[in-house]
């Protein structure tokens, strides 16, 4: 059982919803990343999604694009991101860490080298936004061979064939994008999410985390009423952009604690 599977099994046993926050590695400044990861856990995160900065993040809205640009301007690389995971693991061996990003940095390192390095660092899952599931069997197999879960996105526009393709290669959990468009865009239609998730579960026997458009405790609680987990990203990245750096760790922990409280209410 992977660390992600154990986490979701424990949540189900406690009848709790998962909280999966996203931050961009190296933003707002490289020296804060590990402290921010620990702050997320202290605030009640169950899984951490750590964004690998990339120069052309096509699925991301302006907030996360700016975070990527800030991190890249400070020299953050995939190798550096793995080093931060390794540092985080020195004192936290329980909370799953999922790397989220794009194919280019992985392919530059080499898929096999990346799989070995990520696994050794303590990464639990990898979500590559621009890897189509239909062409991903060897990569997904490589991840699993190294004890990591390959995680995939599904959207309101995903066909049954796409859902089946994802179900064949995915493990850990699925990330359902609740809106068409890029991260951080408009508000969520809860009814359409509630109608869609049972259809996904018919094909894939995996927990489903829902993200894109979750901005506050109220939205998180509403989504938590229909999903296995809530993914929150752009709102956190915006918070870090707007907060003086010396207050970033405290502000992030407080915000996540509010979301946790709403999910558990």
From Swiss-Prot:
Disulfide bonds: none
MF terms in GO: tryptophan synthase activity
Keyword Lyase: yes
Keyword Cytoplasm: no
Keyword vocabulary terms for this entry: Amino-acid biosynthesis, Aromatic amino acid biosynthesis, Lyase, Tryptophan biosynthesis
Reaction(s) catalysed by this chain's protein: (1S,2R)-1-C-(indol-3-yl)glycerol 3-phosphate + L-serine = D-glyceraldehyde 3-phosphate + L-tryptophan + H2O
EC number, UniProt record: 4.2.1.20
InterPro entries in the cross-refs: Aldolase_TIM, RibuloseP-bd_barrel, Trp_synthase_alpha_AS, Trp_synthase_suA
CDD domains per UniProt: Tryptophan_synthase_alpha
Pfam families xref list: Trp_syntA
Pathway of action: Amino-acid biosynthesis; L-tryptophan biosynthesis; L-tryptophan from chorismate: step 5/5
Cellular component GO terms held in the UniProt record: cytosol
Active-site feature positions: 49 (proton acceptor), 60 (proton acceptor)
PANTHER family recorded: TRYPTOPHAN SYNTHASE ALPHA CHAIN, CHLOROPLASTIC, TRYPTOPHAN SYNTHASE, ALPHA CHAIN
HAMAP family in alphabetical order: Trp_synth_alpha
Functional summary from the UniProt entry: The alpha subunit is responsible for the aldol cleavage of indoleglycerol phosphate to indole and glyceraldehyde 3-phosphate.
Quaternary organization: Tetramer of two alpha and two beta chains.
Record-stated family: Belongs to the TrpA family.
Protein name: Tryptophan synthase alpha chain
């Amino acid at each position: 059982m992977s660390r992600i599977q154990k986490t979701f099994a424990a949540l189900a046993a406690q009848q709790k919803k998962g909280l999966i926050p996203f931050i961009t590695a190296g933003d707002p400044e490289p020296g804060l990343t590990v402290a921010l990861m620990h702050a997320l856990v202290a605030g009640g995160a169950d899984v951490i999604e750590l964004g690998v900065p990339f120069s052309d993040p096509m699925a991301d809205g302006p907030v996360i694009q700016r975070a990527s640009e800030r991190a890249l301007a400070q020299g953050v690389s995939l190798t550096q991101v793995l080093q931060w995971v390794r540092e985080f693991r020195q004192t936290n061996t329980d909370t799953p860490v999922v790397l989220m990003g794009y194919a280019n940095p992985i392919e530059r390192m080499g898929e096999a080298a990346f799989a070995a390095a990520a696994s050794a660092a303590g990464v639990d899952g990898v979500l590559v936004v621009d890897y189509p599931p239909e062409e991903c069997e060897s990569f997904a197999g490589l991840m699993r061979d190294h004890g990591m879960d390959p995680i995939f996105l599904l959207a309101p526009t995903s066909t049954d064939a796409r859902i089946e393709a994802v179900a064949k290669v995915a493990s850990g959990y699925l990330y359902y994008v609740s809106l068409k468009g890029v991260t951080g865009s408009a508000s969520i239609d809860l009814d359409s999410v509630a109608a869609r998730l049972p259809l996904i579960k018919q094909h894939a026997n995996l927990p489903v985390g829902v993200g894109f458009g979750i901005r506050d405790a109220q939205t998180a609680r509403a989504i938590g009423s229909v999903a296995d987990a809530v993914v929150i990203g752009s709102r956190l990245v915006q918070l870090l952009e707007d907060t003086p750096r010396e207050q970033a760790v405290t502000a992030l922990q407080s915000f996540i604690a509010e979301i946790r409280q709403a999910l558990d209410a």
